[in-house]
Amino acid sequence: MEGLRRHSVMLDCKLWKDDPIYFFKTLPPYISKYAQRADDASIQAQIDVFGKDDVGAMPGALGPRGNFAAVTFAESFPDRVAMLAYLNEVLSFYECFEKQMTEMLDATLYANPVPKDPKYDNPVWQANYKNTMTKWPKILENLDPKLGPKCVKSLVALVEGTDMEPKMAHYKTMKEYALDRTNYIAWPVACDNAEFGSQLNLTQDQLDSVRDIFLPLWTHSCYVYDYYHYDKEAEIHSTYGKGRSMINSIPLLNRLKGLSVEEAKAWLKQRCFELEKEYLQRKEDYFSENPVEAVPVDLRRWFLSQEDLATGFAIWCATTYHNHPPFGEGYAAPYEKRRKEGALWFEKVTESDQLMTGGFEVRYAN
């Protein structure tokens, strides 16, 4: 697998090695060489939806150890990692604008709406969000006529997916829950984003041939997500979700195993380390039967993409402003720093299309 990385470097060891918040012991996280573009794109998405004076109104993909796209799609091409950063920043607002997202995707929402803070019932923000939802599918298709539409299709499938909430009282095992949760946290969308970002040429048969190898990583990501999103989800649920079952491993572990919140978190963390071992064993078994030189290059790169998805997601979930203090205020420092460096963003959602086609290399003041 040596020599396959072109667009990423290992994240500084000080940011993850031996850190108890990072739930891997062997696999390191990587970050895009173009991480600044990803951050700039995320800020543009914030401006497009909330306006230049409310950047961070809903914290999305930024974090102190890496932008979501920069660490999960680390091997993406420079223009594509920026586009994915914009896309995922916008999609991270789904809990605020679920109705608008569904409408603009021409999808049908079968699940109950996600509980949200009423402050997001802002008609200007809602109109801006609808504008963002008209532009990025076109940009994806222009960048890649094959993989761009695939990303959009998987997002529609996610929106139209079965609601997990009624099932929470009936799951008998964590494995059963994790299979559904993988889809619910948009992992098929993330996989298609990764394939798009790295511009991989893979057949469906090739993807299917290695799918089971990555199942431990997918479950790992479900558990990391539940571990680090629980506190925020519990707060939102207690305020706006009364009468609904909370979709998270922690209340399920309480029902299935009688674990307290802290005991359930300890269980999830330990299980993540076990899942890493399971994945590494499956990977070793695969390459013992399939010599590396006999495996197509893009299929080998798919292994890197899957590992980046899981490791990047793990470090991001543990640190992102989406879940952790200072929350939306975390956008202020990088936004102000870039402004002092002379970076300029488009101030209206109807103008920022020009920025997208340039790979999110922001303009600078003279």
Curated annotation (Swiss-Prot):
Alphabetized InterPro entries for the sequence: Isoprenoid_synthase_dom_sf
Gene3D superfamilies linked to this entry: Farnesyl Diphosphate Synthase
Domain of life: Eukaryota
Keywords, ordered alphabetically: Lyase
SUPFAM superfamilies found in the cross-reference section: Terpenoid synthases (SSF48576)
Claim: Nucleotide-binding is one of the keywords in the record: no
Molecular function terms, GO-annotated: lyase activity
EC number per UniProt: 4.2.3.-
Reactions the enzyme catalyzes: N,N-dimethyl-cadaverine + 2,6,9-trimethyl-13-oxatetracyclo[6.3.1.1(6,9).0(1,5)]tridecane carbocation = pre-flavunoidine + H(+)
Top class in the EC scheme: lyase
Pfam short name (any one): Terpene_syn_C_2
Pathway it works in: Secondary metabolite biosynthesis; terpenoid biosynthesis
GO terms under biological process: terpenoid biosynthetic process
Function: Terpene cyclase-like protein; part of the gene cluster that mediates the biosynthesis of flavunoidine, an alkaloidal terpenoid with a tetracyclic cage-like core connected to dimethylcadaverine via a C-N bond and acylated with 5,5-dimethyl-L-pipecolate. The tetracyclic core is synthesized by the terpene cyclase flvE and the cytochrome P450 monooxygenase flvD.
Complex and partners: Homodimer.
Protein family (similarity comment): Belongs to the terpene synthase family.
Protein name, entry field: Terpene cyclase-like protein flvF
Organism per entry: Aspergillus flavus (strain ATCC 200026 / FGSC A1120 / IAM 13836 / NRRL 3357 / JCM 12722 / SRRC 167)
